[in-house]
């Protein structure tokens, strides 16, 4: 009986599993982006259209061939084709490209002409200069009007001042006449006193 009990206990006891040590967490280092060996797709598309010089515009296939020959785009043609389709659609929306024939990416494309935009700019500048010229004479006229008004007021004040002086001038003339009449008898009496004093000095001299 003891043997059977020991055997059953040995069967029931589960074997202990040894835990493996946890691996240290490795921090993911972000991969450095490789520098792109080609310019942006919109620049390559415009260069392809200008290089092909087709009157009706260039097709997507022709543009793709030009890009793969002249630029280091890679060998994944499916991705290149998808990127090219997106850039063509975005170029039409942003008006950088004009779709001359067809719809979507299956048509023909041309670069928008910049001459029309350059021709419109001088017209706006001329209009602005015309407005400036119109504003300057108005300001000058207003300034001249103010100057004339100031001159007229100044002349009026001068005339009134002259009138006041003319009214006051006769009073000044009357004063000197009265002073001359008062001083004239005093001057005549002075020489008589001097004549009377001279003979007195001559009489004192012989006594010494």
UniProtKB/Swiss-Prot annotation:
Its main location: nucleus. Coiled coil: none annotated. Residues 37-113 form the H15 domain. Gene3D superfamilies: Winged helix-like DNA-binding domain superfamily/Winged helix DNA-binding domain. Residues 148-158, 165-191 have a biased composition (Basic residues). Belongs to the histone H1/H5 family. This is Histone H1.3. It comes from Caenorhabditis elegans. The gene is hil-3.
């Amino acid at each position: 009986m003891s043997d059977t009990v020991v055997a059953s206990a040995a069967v029931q006891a589960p074997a202990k599993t040894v835990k493996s040590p946890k691996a240290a967490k490795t921090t993911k280092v972000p991969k450095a982006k490789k520098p792109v060996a080609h310019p942006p797709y919109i620049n390559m598309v415009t260069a392809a259209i200008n290089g092909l010089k087709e009157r009706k515009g260039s097709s997507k296939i022709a543009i793709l061939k030009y890009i793969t020959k002249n630029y280091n785009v890679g060998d994944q043609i499916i991705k290149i084709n998808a990127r090219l389709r997106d850039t063509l659609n975005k170029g039409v929306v942003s008006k950088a490209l004009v779709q001359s024939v067809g719809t979507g990416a299956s048509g023909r494309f041309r670069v928008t002409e910049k001459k029309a935009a350059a021709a419109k700019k001088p017209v706006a500048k001329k209009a602005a200069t015309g407005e400036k010229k119109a504003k300057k004479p108005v300001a000058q006229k207003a300034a001249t009007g103010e100057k004339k008004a100031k001159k007229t007021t100044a002349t009026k004040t001068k005339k009134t001042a002259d009138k006041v002086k003319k009214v006051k001038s006769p009073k000044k003339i009357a004063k000197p006449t009265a002073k001359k009449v008062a001083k004239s008898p005093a001057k005549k009496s002075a020489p008589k006193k001097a004549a009377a004093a001279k003979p007195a000095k001559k009489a004192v001299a012989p006594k010494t």
